[in-house]
Amino acid sequence: MPTASSKDDEVDLLIDAWSQLLPEVDLTPLDVMSRLRRAAFHLSKLRAKAFASAGIAVWEFDVLAVLRRAGTELSATRLITATMIGSAAMTNRLDKLAERGLVHRRPNPSDGRAILVAITPEGIDRVDAAMTELVRLEADALRDVSRADQALLASALRVLAAGETHEA
């Protein structure tokens, strides 16, 4: 087993071990994706912390943020599309958000079977506080990465995210 130097991290050790077991395999993708997965795990924890500081859960932020960015009321169908969750889950989430006074629902006058959802002033306060704290925490997490490297990383991740349709 390789010995960790001061610059080695868990991914370096993983790559070293696999390169000994499979020397003919280019492990560059594993190196990149393992670091990306670890970064995503840390980002998930940052998001939960930021949202908790504003008194909302991650799922609440997701719905409230869509409404906040829209700047107007949206149909439940539009919220389902934007958040990529099912209709039963959305109904449950909207019930809970309405109970907490974070959204208001009303019948859609042009379609009696549908509802329109609007974010309340309390919902705006919560989602704005959560976003402000999230950006602060993310900036702190990126403090050792130069602006130039952040731009390169964002560019590379944009390409990677667009590649989600290139499944093997």
Summary of predicted features, one role per range:
Residues M1-A54:
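N-terminal leader segment of winged-helix/HTH proteins
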Residues L30-M33, R37, F41, M84, ...:
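Short amphipathic alpha-helical segments with heptad-repeat character
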Residues A57-V58, G71-L116:
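Canonical helix-turn-helix DNA-binding module
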Residues E60-L64:
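Short alpha-helical "packing" element that flanks the helix-turn-helix/winged-helix DNA-binding module
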Residues A65, N92, S155:
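DNA-binding alpha-helical recognition surfaces that contact promoter or target DNA
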Residues A151-A168:
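Exposed, interaction-prone assembly regions rather than primary DNA-binding/catalytic cores
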